[in-house]
Amino acid sequence: MINEIKKDAQTRMQKSLESLTHAFTRIRTGKAHPSILGGVMVPYYGADTPLSQVANVTVKDSRTLQVVAFERNMLAAVDKAIQSSGLGFNPTNLGELLLISMPALTEETRKGFTKQARDAAEDARVAVRNIRRDALSQLKDLVKDKEISEDEERRAADDVQKLTDKFVADIEVAVKQKEADLMAV
């Protein structure tokens, strides 16, 4: 029972870390990478569809993305969706494909993106702490139901705390790495 609680907490904490890593891919650095456009939704036959399902996004060079729509008549809709996405991109329509040049990050935008990264990291830390709280609550319930002793509960609580400390440290490493990527000129 104790092992199940610890395993569940570890799995959920790992998912929080993965969620943070995924959130970091949406924050752009100075380099071009297709995942920057991952959140762009394109109107396709009346429904908003992810860009990846209506077009192929590739890296042309370190500062340029190339977008090729699967259907040529969708190119204008893809262009408009990218412009209105709030990412600050203005695609160049070449008839068969779109080119998106990544503007250089100013000091102000770097600081804004760094703040976004820190906010995402704080959300992940809060999620990990909430998972710890849930696990400790489950352990206390087991003691209350006399399924485990208080000593076992204390040992398991220490293990859960060590797990929490490990994941909080991993989050810290991830945010420091993202900040370094953002501040690199």
Swiss-Prot record:
GO BP, one annotated term: cytoplasmic translational termination
Location relative to the cell: Cytoplasm
Main localization (coarse): cytoplasm
Example of a GO MF term: ribosomal large subunit binding
Gene3D superfamilies referenced in this protein's UniProt entry, alphabetically: 3.30.1360.40, Ribosome-recycling factor
Pfam families attached to this UniProt entry: RRF
GO cellular component, one term: cytosol
Keywords: Cytoplasm, Protein biosynthesis
Top-level taxon in the UniProt lineage: Bacteria
Function: Responsible for the release of ribosomes from messenger RNA at the termination of protein biosynthesis. May increase the efficiency of translation by recycling ribosomes from one round of translation to another.
Protein family membership: Belongs to the RRF family.
Name of the protein described by the UniProt record: Ribosome-recycling factor
Designated gene of the protein: frr
